[in-house]
Amino acid sequence: MTRDDPFAMSRRAVLQSTLGFGALALNGIMAAETLNRPDGRPHFMPKAKRVIWLFMRGGVSHMESFDPKPALNEFAGKSISETPYKSVLDASKIRKLRVPIKGDANGHTRIKIFPMQTGFKRYGQSGIEISDWFPNIGSCADDIAFIRSMWTSDNNHGAQVQFHSGRHFLDPRVPTIGAWINYGLGSLSENLPQFINIGPRFFDKKDAHYLGPAYDAVNLKIDPKNPLDYAKPSNGMTAAEQRRNLELTNKLNRFAAKQYPLDPVIEARIKSYELAFRMQTAVPDALDFSQESSETQKLYGLDRNETKSFGQQLLAARRLSERGVRFIQIMHGDGAAGAWDNHSGLKNGHSRLSRQVDLPTAGLLKDLKRRGLLEDTIVVFATEFGRTPGSQGADGRDHHSFGFSVWMAGGGIKGGITNGSTDELGYHAVEAPHYVTDVHATINHLMGIDPHKLEVPGHKRLEMDFGHVIEEIVF
């Protein structure tokens, strides 16, 4: 079909005007028209079918969440150079940062060590220590693998891009892990897109880049008063009128199919229009929380103002995932950098934010488990970097890329374990250090994907892009 073909000229106009499809439908359905995607089958037997990706924007302090450091209390108020651990500042990573830490190494020796701002308790049969700010996640410790040795090379908030894509913010953009999953695997649902973003975005507003916009996440904003306004038929069009227009458009497409019998795009287009129509029923249904019991709603914190917003997002994630959405990413922390970026007021900031996410996150894990979904759903809880062991100002911590924590649970992940460690001050990942793409590699492995087989002509991937499976945490 040529550019002059009238059936190819205005697909978007037809969808939006003639058929009345909103913005939500457009991105998700156009993947059906892409010709060069893989066949959608896993490369080997998968252990998981879907991913729920929870990302805390701004930088969660590892020593106030999942990596206790009692030495911070022991040496509180002293400079790093006054402790037995002053050698942490000699590491080559500090000298090789592309975006340097604020101040030089000598300046950091003068920064006073900031004590932990909360306590830790042991949870579950595993006895893993978890912050008092995350007691509900603590109650799920035996289902979680805590990775305490993550590192990245960006010490600014562009690290949000790096954690999702594996590439530095200053490098040319490449697809994110969600886009690769969307590109590499076939659909589990005839009615929904395969990659959805709920809530605010990270620094990059796109996911797929050279894979094409068909593989970007479909952005979904949950509004209890009007949950899916932009996916309703436009211009006052009724569902019956939209169906008639759809049938007319499909007749035109089938006429074009007779004129161009060897063109596979036309049949894909017919299917994609049908998908967009079905989405207008399927998505609102997935977001209809009235179908859930009051007990389930309380499990996610929908009965509390502090947890309601994040709880709604996670409940939506569960409902979308059980309906076949492959990859759901949820960002927590508004603002340009992300609300977890507590350069000052860390105790007040982190304790408030943790109350927003702790109960709903634990509720998600417990709900997935009791429904039998956790065994084939990967849940990731991540952030772009940690925070410094030293103070910034009187009561905050600065960005820290050399060592921090994330956790994974669910499909194929061992529960009740920790992997890797940082040094006594939480400064460097010293045991089993993992670059951010090791998380990607682990997800790909569990989803049955060999990323080396997803190469796109003209876009050579680096070895660092693939990462290494964190073997110690998978079955």
Regions found by a protein language model. Give the residues of each.
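Ligand-binding pockets and gating/stacking loops
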Residues: M1-F475
